[in-house]
Amino acid sequence: MDPHDDHPDAILRLPDPGATDALARRLAPALRAGDTILLEGEIGAGKTHFARALIRARLAALGLDEDVPSPTFTIVQTYEAGEAEIWHADLYRLSGPEEIWELGLEDAFRTAICLVEWPDRLGSLRPSDALTLRFAAEQDDSRRLGLHASGPRAQALLRDLLAGAGA
């Protein structure tokens, strides 16, 4: 559990899936190898939707139209996306850091753009410089998104993202 859950750096309201897609499209071009986005929230909160929208946006910018499946059963999906490979990991079914180490995710944190669902499973492997997006479903089907940046690169991404969101 992220110690900043109760005190995010910023909170956004995403009224519908289109707003989630738009946010993902804004963030996608800013990401580079070594960037990590940690996606938190309950099942159905919007983590996978956001990750898939971001990956699609990154691939579309390269003229690619690939299927972007959920990594729920494969645990990790990778995509060649120009200058940086993208790793989309869903750690829900893993029990802890030792299984994550076997996947090679620790190395990917340095060499790829990493989108990680259920980052609480990372334990001590959690990157110190990461942008955390905490999704929460609201009663009206909108999403409340808490954002927290830990580290200088994540802080720069958050500033740019909020500037583009008009926050």
Outline where the language-model segments fall.
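P-loop (Walker A) phosphate-binding loop of NTP-binding proteins
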Residues: E42
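Conserved lysine of the Walker
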Residues: K47
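Post-Walker A helix-loop "phosphate-sensing" segment adjacent to the P-loop in P-loop NTPases
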Residues: R56-D67
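N-terminal pre-Walker A segment at the start of P-loop NTPase domains
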Residues: D2-A24
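Conserved nucleotide-sensing/catalytic segment adjacent to the nucleotide-binding pocket
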Residues: D67-E117
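Hydrophobic anchor at the beta1->P-loop junction of P-loop NTPases
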Residues: I37-L39
